[in-house]
Design a protein with these regions (language model features):
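Membrane-embedded alpha-helical segments of integral membrane proteins
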Residues: 1-16
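Internal/C-terminal transmembrane anchor helices
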Residues: 24-45
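Membrane/wall-proximal cationic-aromatic binding patches
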Residues: 41-116, 122-123, 292-296, 304, ...
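Conserved SGNH/GDSL esterase-like catalytic core that processes O-acyl groups on lipids
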Residues: 99-180
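Serine-dependent acyl-ester chemistry module
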Residues: 158-275, 288-294, 298-299, 303, ...
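Histidine-centered active-site loop/cap adjacent to the catalytic His
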Residues: 284, 304-339
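Short, amphipathic alpha-helical "lid/cap" segments that border enzyme active or binding sites
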Residues: 131, 135, 229, 233, ...
Length: 339
């Protein structure tokens, strides 16, 4: 497709030459200039732009350059489990995967590997995984292992509850923000985005967000809905029981707050509501919101368009986990099953 941009630009360049002594030459020059500018921008975003983005489709160059997958389809997972060391498994979505990070070594799971050389730390994470998917993927990758699993760290983000919502729940808990309707311009730009990386970048950063702004408000309402919340807690309980019964492993949940904006990060009461529900359920958890709130989103996110945790935020997560395990050393003790 990019060849077509070059061909059209050259065509207008030829017209400028052919019409140089004609009035239409000025129009040809204008069109040539516009085409040259557009083609240059297209070339930049298509071949040279390397910033990460919270929307996966806008970070193709970044992901192609920095995301390498192992034979298990994961990013430096360190599978299979060790049979000689106790295993610590970090499970989650894009935050565990290391979205926005250039090197896997910047992930908090790798920092735990450095701190606990006696443990084999496994990273199970891919963008888009929710709690139910994470449970299924844990079964897939760990299965009936002979390795001892001491601890599973489930990295939790505040959209995982959305998987539990039924159509009836969505009707009962509408978003406080009215949904925006797609216009003819939206359809036109979405179509053009299939053929232009420049249009795609501009539209999905500036125009598209308004179409999904209502989603976050509805997700937050699900956490306030006791029916949806209890259903979600039951999913977490099922996973905890799986770990205890099949692997004699403990579960530690690390709660990551929103980094999309400062106001979302500072919604302490919202986060505390779910933390209280976890505490009542007897879950062992670490909330990163109080720690992150003292720093501010600009120190924690990858960039303004990518609210994933940056290397500094990953270090804070690793430090919080290490501090928690220092205070509760029994968490890493693996029960030995007597034959």
């Amino acid at each position: 497709m990019f060849i077509a941009y070059i061909a059209i630009t050259l065509l207008f360049g030829l017209l400028v030459y052919l019409l140089r002594r004609h009035r239409a030459g000025n129009l040809a020059l204008l069109l040539f200039t516009l085409c040259l500018c557009f083609t240059s921008l297209e070339a930049y975003y298509r071949f040279f732009y390397l910033k990460s983005d919270g929307m996966g489709r806008l970070m193709k160059n970044f992901s192609d350059r920095y995301y390498q997958y192992d034979s298990h389809g994961l990013r430096a997972s360190h599978l299979p489990l060790s049979r000689t060391k106790d295993n610590l498994i970090v499970l989650g979505d894009s935050h565990v995967f290391g979205a926005g990070l250039k090197h896997p070594a910047e992930r908090f799971s790798e920092l735990l590997t450095q701190h606990y050389p006696a443990l084999h730390v496994v990273n199970l994470g891919l963008p888009g995984w929710d709690t139910k998917t994470e449970t299924a993927q844990f079964r897939k990758y760990v299965g009936e292992t002979d390795g001892r699993v001491a601890l599973v760290i489930l990295t939790y983000f505040y959209n995982d509850i959305e998987e539990e919502a039924t159509p009836a729940d969505r009707a009962r808990d509408p978003s406080p923000d009215p949904p925006a309707k797609e216009t003819a311009l939206d359809h036109a730009l979405q179509f053009a985005s299939k053929y232009s990386r420049f249009v795609e970048m501009i539209y999905y950063r500036l125009g598209y967000p308004r179409l999904v702004r209502d989603r976050l408000g509805q997700i937050q309402r699900f956490y306030s809905d006791p029916v949806v919340r209890e259903r979600h807690l039951a999913t977490l309980e099922q996973f905890r029981e799986l770990l205890q019964e099949r692997y004699s492993a403990r579960l530690l949940i690390v709660l990551l707050p929103y980094l999309h904006s400062e106001s979302l990060l500072q919604q302490t009461k919202f986060y505390q509501m779910f933390e209280q529900a976890l505490a009542q359920g007897g879950f062992d958890f670490i909330s990163m919101q109080p720690v992150f709130a003292t720093q501010g989103v600009e120190k924690l996110w990858v960039n303004r368009f990518d609210p994933h945790t940056n290397p500094f935020a990953n270090r804070l997560v690793a430090n919080a986990i290490i501090e928690h395990l220092n205070q509760h050393p029994e968490v890493l003790l693996t029960p030995r099953v007597t034959p």
